[in-house]
Amino acid sequence: MVEEAYTDLRVAVKLFEIGEEPWVIVFHAQQAVEKALKAYLVLHNRHFGKTHNLFRLIDLCSEIDQEFQQLHELEIDKLYPLAIEARYPDTGIEITIDEAKEAIEKARIAISFITRKIKSKKS
């Protein structure tokens, strides 16, 4: 799943580079973080149910390793409502290009952190 997370991150970056709509960039950044978190939980044989909620996934990872709380402090979990709600009409949410750029950076930070945790577990 970590490979898929990096793929979604690369997609978000490419979409940013070609000037795609900010909401679709944020969506792929959120998906990247979600897949990385789920990869960590799978590695630890933790059930997470059917959820896309980053706040919940970070909490589940924090039960294994308290350092995951840093992701809450960095507001990584805020990608979830931004990515999900902005995809639907009439929500009143409009994402700016600056928010899309920030989403990519947050995804990079989160995936790098999670990848280090996965590698340390495997070694």
Whereabouts are the PLM-identified features?
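Terminal alpha-helical segments
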Residues: 1-123
